[in-house]
A protein has these predicted regions:
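Amide-donor transfer/coupling interface in amidating biosynthetic enzymes
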Residues: 107-190
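Hydrophobic anchor at the start of a short beta-strand
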Residues: 26-27, 75, 165
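Cofactor-binding loop segments of dinucleotide-utilizing enzymes, especially the Rossmann-like FAD-
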Residues: 8, 80, 170
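Flexible, glycine-rich phosphate/dinucleotide-binding loops
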Residues: 12, 35, 84, 91, ...
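Short coil/turn connectors at secondary-structure junctions
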Residues: 38, 71-73, 95-96, 129-130, ...
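Redox-cofactor binding/interface segments in oxidoreductases and associated redox assembly factors
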Residues: 43, 77, 168
Length: 190
Protein backbone atom coordinates (compact mmCIF):
# COMPACT_ATOMS: atom_id res chain seq x y z
CA UNK A 1 0.00 0.00 0.00
CA UNK A 2 1.41 3.34 -1.08
CA UNK A 3 -0.08 6.72 -0.16
CA UNK A 4 1.01 9.91 -1.87
CA UNK A 5 1.13 13.34 -0.29
CA UNK A 6 0.77 16.31 -2.64
CA UNK A 7 4.10 18.07 -2.07
CA UNK A 8 3.72 21.30 -4.03
CA UNK A 9 3.37 23.58 -1.00
CA UNK A 10 2.09 23.43 2.56
CA UNK A 11 2.50 20.95 5.40
CA UNK A 12 3.03 17.79 3.37
CA UNK A 13 5.95 16.59 5.54
CA UNK A 14 3.69 16.26 8.59
CA UNK A 15 1.21 14.08 6.69
CA UNK A 16 4.07 11.94 5.42
CA UNK A 17 5.34 11.47 8.99
CA UNK A 18 1.88 10.42 10.19
CA UNK A 19 1.65 7.79 7.45
CA UNK A 20 5.16 6.52 8.16
CA UNK A 21 4.25 6.23 11.87
CA UNK A 22 1.56 3.77 10.72
CA UNK A 23 4.12 1.77 8.73
CA UNK A 24 2.65 2.94 5.42
CA UNK A 25 4.85 3.74 2.43
CA UNK A 26 4.40 7.47 1.86
CA UNK A 27 5.68 9.29 -1.21
CA UNK A 28 5.83 12.95 -2.14
CA UNK A 29 3.81 13.74 -5.27
CA UNK A 30 4.92 16.70 -7.39
CA UNK A 31 4.37 15.41 -10.93
CA UNK A 32 1.89 13.01 -12.57
CA UNK A 33 4.56 10.29 -12.79
CA UNK A 34 4.77 10.28 -8.97
CA UNK A 35 1.19 8.90 -8.85
CA UNK A 36 2.36 5.55 -10.23
CA UNK A 37 1.42 2.81 -7.78
CA UNK A 38 -0.25 5.27 -5.39
CA UNK A 39 -3.63 4.14 -3.98
CA UNK A 40 -4.47 7.26 -2.00
CA UNK A 41 -3.48 10.93 -2.13
CA UNK A 42 -3.54 13.51 0.66
CA UNK A 43 -3.70 17.18 -0.38
CA UNK A 44 -2.35 19.13 2.61
CA UNK A 45 -3.07 22.46 4.18
CA UNK A 46 -1.15 25.46 2.90
CA UNK A 47 -2.23 28.06 0.38
CA UNK A 48 -5.07 26.81 -1.81
CA UNK A 49 -4.45 29.25 -4.69
CA UNK A 50 -0.79 28.21 -4.95
CA UNK A 51 -1.65 24.51 -4.75
CA UNK A 52 -4.28 24.92 -7.48
CA UNK A 53 -2.01 26.89 -9.82
CA UNK A 54 0.94 24.51 -9.45
CA UNK A 55 -1.20 21.37 -9.80
CA UNK A 56 -2.67 22.75 -13.04
CA UNK A 57 0.72 23.86 -14.36
CA UNK A 58 2.26 20.42 -13.76
CA UNK A 59 -0.76 18.50 -15.09
CA UNK A 60 -1.40 16.89 -11.72
CA UNK A 61 -5.03 17.96 -11.47
CA UNK A 62 -5.99 16.14 -14.66
CA UNK A 63 -3.94 13.05 -13.75
CA UNK A 64 -5.64 12.90 -10.33
CA UNK A 65 -9.11 13.28 -11.86
CA UNK A 66 -8.38 10.45 -14.31
CA UNK A 67 -7.06 8.10 -11.61
CA UNK A 68 -10.06 8.84 -9.38
CA UNK A 69 -12.54 8.35 -12.25
CA UNK A 70 -11.02 4.92 -12.95
CA UNK A 71 -11.47 3.90 -9.30
CA UNK A 72 -7.72 3.78 -8.75
CA UNK A 73 -7.33 6.60 -6.23
CA UNK A 74 -8.81 7.84 -2.96
CA UNK A 75 -8.23 11.54 -2.21
CA UNK A 76 -8.27 13.45 1.09
CA UNK A 77 -7.98 17.22 1.20
CA UNK A 78 -7.18 18.89 4.53
CA UNK A 79 -7.77 22.64 5.02
CA UNK A 80 -6.38 24.20 1.81
CA UNK A 81 -6.56 20.74 0.24
CA UNK A 82 -10.29 20.64 1.03
CA UNK A 83 -10.72 24.01 -0.68
CA UNK A 84 -8.84 22.69 -3.73
CA UNK A 85 -11.14 19.62 -3.88
CA UNK A 86 -14.38 21.65 -3.86
CA UNK A 87 -16.44 22.26 -6.98
CA UNK A 88 -17.26 25.74 -5.66
CA UNK A 89 -15.05 28.15 -3.72
CA UNK A 90 -17.39 30.88 -2.48
CA UNK A 91 -16.15 34.33 -3.51
CA UNK A 92 -13.35 32.92 -5.70
CA UNK A 93 -15.01 31.58 -8.87
CA UNK A 94 -11.78 31.72 -10.91
CA UNK A 95 -9.47 30.04 -8.39
CA UNK A 96 -7.85 26.88 -9.85
CA UNK A 97 -9.24 23.76 -8.20
CA UNK A 98 -9.40 20.00 -8.53
CA UNK A 99 -13.19 20.24 -8.21
CA UNK A 100 -13.89 16.57 -7.51
CA UNK A 101 -16.37 17.03 -4.64
CA UNK A 102 -19.82 18.58 -5.00
CA UNK A 103 -19.30 20.92 -2.06
CA UNK A 104 -19.14 24.69 -1.66
CA UNK A 105 -16.36 25.92 0.61
CA UNK A 106 -15.74 29.32 2.19
CA UNK A 107 -12.05 30.13 2.62
CA UNK A 108 -10.80 31.45 5.99
CA UNK A 109 -14.32 31.18 7.41
CA UNK A 110 -13.06 31.19 11.00
CA UNK A 111 -11.03 34.35 10.52
CA UNK A 112 -7.36 35.22 10.41
CA UNK A 113 -4.32 33.41 11.82
CA UNK A 114 -4.79 34.87 15.32
CA UNK A 115 -8.29 33.38 15.43
CA UNK A 116 -7.01 29.84 14.85
CA UNK A 117 -8.04 27.31 17.53
CA UNK A 118 -8.13 23.68 18.62
CA UNK A 119 -11.27 21.73 19.44
CA UNK A 120 -12.28 18.16 20.26
CA UNK A 121 -14.65 16.88 17.56
CA UNK A 122 -17.04 13.96 17.50
CA UNK A 123 -16.27 12.27 14.17
CA UNK A 124 -18.49 9.58 12.74
CA UNK A 125 -16.73 6.22 12.94
CA UNK A 126 -14.30 7.17 15.73
CA UNK A 127 -14.80 5.78 19.23
CA UNK A 128 -13.66 8.94 21.04
CA UNK A 129 -13.28 12.65 20.20
CA UNK A 130 -10.55 13.78 17.82
CA UNK A 131 -8.48 16.83 18.81
CA UNK A 132 -8.68 19.01 15.68
CA UNK A 133 -6.47 21.98 14.83
CA UNK A 134 -8.15 24.78 12.85
CA UNK A 135 -5.75 27.29 11.23
CA UNK A 136 -7.44 29.95 9.05
CA UNK A 137 -9.83 27.12 8.38
CA UNK A 138 -12.45 26.89 5.65
CA UNK A 139 -16.04 25.83 6.27
CA UNK A 140 -18.04 23.55 4.02
CA UNK A 141 -21.13 25.70 3.42
CA UNK A 142 -23.07 23.34 1.16
CA UNK A 143 -22.88 19.65 0.36
CA UNK A 144 -24.18 18.04 -2.80
CA UNK A 145 -25.93 14.78 -3.42
CA UNK A 146 -24.11 11.74 -2.07
CA UNK A 147 -21.90 13.74 0.30
CA UNK A 148 -22.02 12.52 3.90
CA UNK A 149 -21.23 14.84 6.81
CA UNK A 150 -18.74 13.14 9.16
CA UNK A 151 -18.19 16.01 11.62
CA UNK A 152 -19.42 19.45 12.58
CA UNK A 153 -18.00 22.21 14.74
CA UNK A 154 -21.16 23.63 16.26
CA UNK A 155 -23.48 24.02 13.28
CA UNK A 156 -20.63 24.28 10.74
CA UNK A 157 -19.69 21.32 8.55
CA UNK A 158 -15.96 20.56 8.84
CA UNK A 159 -15.50 16.98 7.55
CA UNK A 160 -17.27 15.22 4.67
CA UNK A 161 -17.01 12.07 2.57
CA UNK A 162 -18.28 11.11 -0.86
CA UNK A 163 -17.31 7.66 -2.06
CA UNK A 164 -13.47 7.60 -1.85
CA UNK A 165 -13.14 11.36 -1.32
CA UNK A 166 -12.64 13.12 2.02
CA UNK A 167 -12.46 16.84 2.77
CA UNK A 168 -11.68 18.22 6.23
CA UNK A 169 -11.40 21.84 7.37
CA UNK A 170 -8.89 21.00 10.08
CA UNK A 171 -5.28 19.77 10.26
CA UNK A 172 -5.21 16.14 11.53
CA UNK A 173 -1.48 15.90 10.80
CA UNK A 174 -0.65 18.37 13.60
CA UNK A 175 -2.14 16.29 16.42
CA UNK A 176 -0.08 13.11 16.75
CA UNK A 177 -3.37 11.15 16.55
CA UNK A 178 -3.09 8.75 13.61
CA UNK A 179 -6.68 7.44 13.67
CA UNK A 180 -7.90 9.44 10.66
CA UNK A 181 -4.79 8.65 8.66
CA UNK A 182 -5.31 4.95 9.45
CA UNK A 183 -8.95 5.18 8.29
CA UNK A 184 -7.87 6.91 5.08
CA UNK A 185 -5.37 4.12 4.39
CA UNK A 186 -8.24 1.62 4.75
CA UNK A 187 -10.40 3.74 2.41
CA UNK A 188 -7.58 3.77 -0.15
CA UNK A 189 -7.11 0.03 0.24
CA UNK A 190 -10.68 -0.31 -1.00
Amino acid sequence: MKIGVLALQGDFREHKQMLEALGVEAVEVRLPKHLTGVHGLIAPGGESTTIGKLAAEYGLDEAIRERYACGELAVWGTCAGAIWMAQEIIGYPDQPRLGLMPIAVRRNAYGRQVESFEEDLEIQGLDRPFHAVFIRAPVIERVGEGVEVLARHGDRVVFVQQDRLWASSFHPELTGDTRLHARFVELARG
